[in-house]
Amino acid sequence: MIRELMTVQNKPVELLLTSAAVKKGAPIDVDSEDQTVKHTADGLGTKLCDINATYEGLNAIVEPTDDAFENAAAGVRVRVIQTLPGEMYATSELDTDTLQAGDKLQAKGGKFVKATAGQYAYEYRGIYSDPTGIKMGKIVRVEIATAG
């Protein structure tokens, strides 16, 4: 899940197809050759995934819930969120039980984890109290720096 808490408005919107399954709020990479998206296996994760709600089938008559659009299979169009330093997001793609406010974050396996060495682009800022009850943590995009 992803919530855009403090972001720069009117950024260009990039909609791309996934080459593998991704989760909403996950750090992603864009393949420059075929312009597809996959979760960040190991790196900075400076781009985030957002999955737009679709109002087809049952969702045409019943308002879908947030969790109805948590996962995107391969070949699904997703919105690529280009993050900028200073922006704040809330995401479910981290383990809030193992992190403390101020921890530096890297992307590994499509999730945010504590950076112990190497470069990082995010800081953990604590738990986000989402009105839907989804367990989320606040992250702030920072200038790229080296941990350790």
Feature map (PLM): residue ranges:
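Surface-exposed, low-hydrophobicity beta-strand/loop segments enriched in small/polar/acidic residues
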Residues: 1-148
